[in-house]
Every structure is written in C-alpha cells, then in structure tokens.
C-alpha cells in the first residue's frame, strides 16, 4: 500500500545526471503518494551513517572498505572540528584486488590506508569480508581501531540522511 509511505530515500554508488534521470523516472512510475523522494550517493550515505554513530567512532578518520568484483573501494571521512560548522572531507580510492580473498593484499591496502594516520574506526562491507580469510590484515586493522563488518551501512545511512532532511537536528550541524 503506497499510501503509507511518508518518504523514500534511494542510495546508489554514483549519483550522476543519468542515474538521477533513471531513478526519477522509476520512482515516478511507482505513483507514490508522497513528494518526499530523495536520492543520495554511497559517499553521502557513509557520511550520514557516521553522523549518527557515537562520536568516538568518527573523532579521527573513519574508513570504509567495500569489497567489489576485482577491487576494494575505500572511502575515508575526516572532520575538521576547528571550523564552525564542522566540515567533513571525504576521500575515495580504489585498489585493484585481482586475487580473491588475499589476506596479504588486504594487509597491504590496510597499511596504505592506516599507516601514520589516526583512524577511529574501519567498516568492512561486502559478502567476501564475512568469510574467514582475513587473519593478519584483520589483526592489523584492529590495533587501536574499532572494526565493523556488515552489509547494510549504505541503507542505514540513507535512512539517516532522510531523517536529517525531514527533521534537521543538531547532529547534522
């Protein structure tokens, strides 16, 4: 029953002009009884997800690693607390990962991301991270950092993003 939908947020990897056209046409075809339809990229979803976590998880840099087909895509969020409002910076990188589930290659990537950096937390998303192949790389990531594994971070971030649009709060300032 589409009458019960108050708002809808869709998140996707890249939100370019073409994707926006496709999503707008698709949601228009749903004939929803709401004008609260929004779209955001995975980068924005990662930002909103972090905002709604305890501050100690994003006090320093926060890293997300997304396991893809033959690569690991990473997002690194850092907040400048010396500005008002606080400014968040996001850096996106992609690392080739030609050998599936290589602990050695993952540790190499982890070191590139974390060495000489203050990292509060690391999020590992993608089904492959749930399997039991990361021994040394996971041990490295867990030293002085909180590490989380799951697959719903972008969808939760989309929900938080919509909440912030509907009722802006202190969290988003």
Please place each PLM-identified region on the residue numbering.
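Conserved phosphate-binding loops in N-terminal lobes of ATP-dependent enzymes
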Residues: 1-15, 93-108, 112-119
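Nucleotide/phosphate-binding catalytic cleft detector across ATP-hydrolyzing
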Residues: 1-62, 83-84, 143-144
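Glycine-rich beta-strand-to-loop/alpha-helix junction loops that act as flexible
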Residues: 11-13, 121-130, 158
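A short acidic (Asp/Glu
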Residues: 18-24, 49-52, 74-77, 130-137
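A short acidic Gly-Thr/Ser loop motif
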Residues: 56-73, 78-80, 126-129, 171-173
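Short glycine-rich, Thr/Ser-proximal phosphate-binding strand/loop in the N-terminal lobe
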Residues: 74-104
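Repeat-based blade/solenoid architectures
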Residues: 152-157
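Acidic, glycine/GT-rich loop-and beta-edge segments that sit at the periphery of enzyme/chaperone cores
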Residues: 160-173
């Amino acid at each position: 029953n589409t009458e019960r939908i108050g708002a809808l947020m869709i998140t996707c990897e890249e939100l370019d002009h073409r994707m926006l056209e496709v999503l707008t046409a698709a949601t228009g075809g749903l004939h929803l009884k709401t004008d609260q339809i929004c779209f955001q990229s995975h980068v924005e979803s990662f930002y909103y997800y972090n905002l709604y976590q305890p501050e100690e998880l994003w006090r320093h840099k926060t890293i997300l690693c997304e396991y893809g087909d033959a690569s690991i895509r990473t997002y690194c969020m850092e907040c400048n607390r010396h500005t008002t409002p606080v400014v968040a910076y996001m850096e996106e990188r992609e690392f080739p990962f030609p050998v599936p589930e290589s602990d050695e290659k993952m540790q190499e990537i982890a070191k590139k991301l974390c060495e000489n950096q203050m990292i509060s937390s690391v999020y590992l998303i993608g089904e492959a991270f749930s399997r039991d192949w990361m021994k040394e790389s996971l041990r490295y990531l867990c030293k002085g950092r909180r590490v989380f594994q799951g697959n719903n971070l972008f969808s939760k971030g989309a929900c938080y993003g919509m909440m912030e649009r509907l009722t802006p709060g202190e969290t988003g300032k």
